[in-house]
A protein has these predicted regions:
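PLP-dependent aminotransferase class I/II
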Residues: 1-114
Length: 114
């Protein structure tokens, strides 16, 4: 997926030690499909997706009444993550067949929109 034009895969820094619970990726503005189209295509084929809600935490309802500081220019990179990113499931019950199916659906989605 990382090699597909219009997609930016999640990544970590060398010194980061993480446990992946979801595989996140962003759909670039020049991608042949939108986040909504990707969600609908995959959902129709039984692949669950979730929006990446952590992009701009200040846009979450729970932060509406909490005092905070933010730049006058806003947080455009955080907003972009929130608006254009999706995550795919990763958990201990997925087996090789499940992962293969998810990958096949991603390939079919790409072929459908290009």
């Amino acid at each position: 997926m990382a090699s597909r034009e219009g997609i930016t895969s999640g990544r970590t820094q060398k010194e980061t030690d993480t446990t992946w619970m979801r595989f996140c990726f962003s759909i670039d503005e020049d991608a042949p499909f939108t986040r909504t189209q990707a969600q609908e295509f995959l959902a129709d084929r039984g692949v669950s997706t979730r929006m990446v809600w952590t992009g701009n935490i200040l846009r979450q309802p729970g932060f509406a009444s909490i005092d905070h500081r933010s730049p006058d220019t806003g947080l455009p990179n955080c907003d972009r993550m929130m608006e254009r990113s999706l995550s795919l499931p990763i958990h201990h019950r997925l087996n090789a067949d499940h992962i293969g199916y998810i990958c096949e659906q991603l390939d079919q989605m790409w072929e459908h929109y290009t």
